[in-house]
Amino acid sequence: DVEVKLMNEMRYDAATIGNHEFDFGLDNMARIFREAAFPIVCANYHFEGTVLEGLVRPYVILERKGVKVGVFGLGTQLEGMVASENYKGVTYEDPVTAANRVADELKNKEHCDLVVCLSHLGWDIDGLDDTELVSATRHIDIVLGGHSHTYFEHPEVLKNADGEDVYCNQMGKHGRYVGMLLLEMSPTGD
């Protein structure tokens, strides 16, 4: 509750879902998500038939200074990490599949100038992480990550499936650091 109130005061544009959001079950998540003054986005958890149906979107499109920004979220595999009764009815989709589908929609159908992934997959961990996600996907420009509690002093730049640069950043844990990423875009979108 305190976190959402602070996020509201800080005027967050969007947030995604981490494994700890499931710690107290779906009813608690729904209550907290209703308090959020910003959208909750996650493209690879599907909530049809649960109390979270309609509270979580796959993505949101923001307009900032004439730049159209598509923002979507991804969550980690819950099985083995969260008690199964705490995510009953939630369907998990492979993050790479979900990311490619949504990023393509944002870039090619919605014509977003910039596509940002809010990832809770982690960095340099066993299993699918942000490094593997980037190398297997297209159309993502920035990955703002979490889960592994990694702190980057400067963004890491990785190559996507097309050999294009993707900027990745993480700010550790417990709100110890606040990140700021300044982007310059040319009129052609470069």
What are these regions (language model features)?
Residues 1-190:
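Acidic, metal/ion-coordinating pockets
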